[in-house]
């Protein structure tokens, strides 16, 4: 299984407008910078402003708007702000990158922690663990719904005779393709994003929108900082145990998805050894044929689910 050649023509991105949730840090911010260098006008929709300054000379390409992805009203307002910022009055790319860190603990762990079952005392409602589902899945559903709604607005000077090359990009995780017995809500949310992608991709072309999904392996970002620090406190180097992929590789995969007009309906696994098409289709066992060698390499490297 050979990795994909992610070479693509970045000139096709010049002058386009993108809406990126979770664009203030991590993968979202790194992607925003890469696309801005290619001439894309970026709206960063996040609950916080960018964590570091944008590139000198490219400030005019960036627009920040507060956005809580779990709130429909907040997302609607953010999309409207992005459309007002876009020089063409339209959006070309929507990237659902907002996410929360893995909430530790299997559902069984959480149930046992609630104590002995009783009819006298109600069990506590899960809070922090459910946040994974609220942000990662519900947030992605809202973003993709509104993205497909607002991507239909034509830009000024758009030739209706030319084919549209707009793009909706989901971000799941390799956790959407494997068992995760040490956590429940994070993989559940990512499996949900994968399901949303698979149920959506066959229909988006009728709106002139391509639809793709990223399924990255672990990479060093603010989201995994709590886990990284907890493992370090136990004397475990997370980077060595997991063999991080690079955030640059994830950015390259995202760029390949939006800049390549022939790429549609593909789920890309970003691994330390390269980026692979998971072939998440019926003909290829819904990704299983590709996933087996991918996970075997991770086990050979010392990863234990």
UniProtKB/Swiss-Prot annotation:
GO terms for molecular function: 2,4-dienoyl-CoA reductase (NADPH) activity. Belongs to the short-chain dehydrogenases/reductases (SDR) family. The gene is swtcG. It catalyses: (1'S,5'S)-5'-hydroxyaverantin + NAD(+) = (S)-5'-oxoaverantin + NADH + H(+); (1'S,5'R)-5'-hydroxyaverantin + NAD(+) = (S)-5'-oxoaverantin + NADH + 2 H(+). Pfam families: adh_short. It is an enzyme of class 1 (oxidoreductase). NADP(+) binds at residues 25, 27, 48, 68, 186, 190, 221. The active site is at 186 (proton acceptor), 190 (lowers pka of active site tyr). This is 5'-hydroxyaverantin dehydrogenase stcG. It comes from Emericella nidulans (strain FGSC A4 / ATCC 38163 / CBS 112.46 / NRRL 194 / M139) (Aspergillus nidulans). The lineage of its organism: Eukaryota, Fungi, Dikarya, Ascomycota, Pezizomycotina. It comes from the Eukaryota. Keywords: NADP, Oxidoreductase. 5'-hydroxyaverantin dehydrogenase; part of the gene cluster that mediates the biosynthesis of sterigmatocystin (ST), a polyketide-derived furanocoumarin which is part of the most toxic and carcinogenic compounds among the known mycotoxins. The first step in the biosynthesis of sterigmatocystin is the production of hexanoate by the fatty acid synthase (FAS) units stcJ and stcK. The polyketide backbone is assembled by the non-reducing polyketide synthase stcA by condensation of the starter hexanoyl-CoA and 7 malonyl-CoA extender units followed by cyclization and release of norsolorinic acid. Induction: The genes forming the sterigmatocystin biosynthesis cluster are co-regulated and induced on oatmeal porridge or the fungal isolates were grown either on oatmeal porridge or in YEC medium (0.2% yeast extract, 5.0% corn steep liquor). GO terms for biological process: fatty acid beta-oxidation; sterigmatocystin biosynthetic process. Its EC number is 1.1.1.352. InterPro entries: NAD(P)-bd_dom_sf, Sc_DH/Rdtase_CS, SDR_fam. Gene3D superfamilies: NAD(P)-binding Rossmann-like Domain. Pathway: Mycotoxin biosynthesis; sterigmatocystin biosynthesis. GO terms for cellular component: mitochondrion.
């Amino acid at each position: 299984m050979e990795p994909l050649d992610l070479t693509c023509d970045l000139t096709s991105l010049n002058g386009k407008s993108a809406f990126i949730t979770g664009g203030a840090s991590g993968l979202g911010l790194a992607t925003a910078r890469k696309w801005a260098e290619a001439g894309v006008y970026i709206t960063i929709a996040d609950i916080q402003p960018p964590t570091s300054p944008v590139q000198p000379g490219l400030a005019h390409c960036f627009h920040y708007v507060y956005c809580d992805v779990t709130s429909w009203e907040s997302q609607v307002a953010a999309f409207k702000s992005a459309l007002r910022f876009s020089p063409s009055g339209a959006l070309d790319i929507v990237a659902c990158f907002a996410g929360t860190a893995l909430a530790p603990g299997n559902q069984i762990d959480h149930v046992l922690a609630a104590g002995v079952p009783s009819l006298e005392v109600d069990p506590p409602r899960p809070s922090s663990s459910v946040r994974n589902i609220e942000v990662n899945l519900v947030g992605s559903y809202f973003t993709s719904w509104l993205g497909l709604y607002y991507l239909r607005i034509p830009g000024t000077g758009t030739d209706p005779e030319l084919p549209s090359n707009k793009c909706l990009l989901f971000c799941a995780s390799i956790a959407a393709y494997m068992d995760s017995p040490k956590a429940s809500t994070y993989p559940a949310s990512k499996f949900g994003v994968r399901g949303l992608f698979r149920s959506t991709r066959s229909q988006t072309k009728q709106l002139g929108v391509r639809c793709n999904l990223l399924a990255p392996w672990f990479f060093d970002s603010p989201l995994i900082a709590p886990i990284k620090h907890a493992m370090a406190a136990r004397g475990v180097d997370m980077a060595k145990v997991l063999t991080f992929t690079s955030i640059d590789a994830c950015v390259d995969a995202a760029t390949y998805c939006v800049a390549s007009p022939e790429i549609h309906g593909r789920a890309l696994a970003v691994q330390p050894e390269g980026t692979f098409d998971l072939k998440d289709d019926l003909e290829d066992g819904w990704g299983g044929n590709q996933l087996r060698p991918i996970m075997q390499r991770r086990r050979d490297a010392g990863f234990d689910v």
